[in-house]
């Protein structure tokens, strides 16, 4: 029993600093759609971001966007802009704002806000007050998008 309590205490002490750096969805600071500061206080992982981008149950970005960097993925969307060279067109802070809540940049967009926890309709009660992506997943997707440059 002592070791279980000690393990929980240890995990709590080391997990809290990581959570303390994370910006809650309601606290994200947008400046004309731009989010300058990382949502997590650390750099995103482009490889993990690629996985989130392609995952039909997470980002599902390919439902709307085409991306020729992912030829192994089928059924790229044609509704939203092609993402080839997106890192040449937008800065990291702009992409962070677009992924977090595209409506702050493009008022009439159909793109979902991936990092908000209110002001939307969720089809299942279990998803109320929850963002689609975590702060880390947003940072990871942004890191991945920053790799998409023209050749």
Task: Name each model-derived stretch.
Residues 22-56:
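Electrostatic cytochrome c docking/interface patches
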Residues 97, 114-151:
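C-terminal capping alpha-helices of c-type cytochrome domains
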Residues 49, 57-68, 95, 111, ...:
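The canonical Cys-X-X-Cys-His
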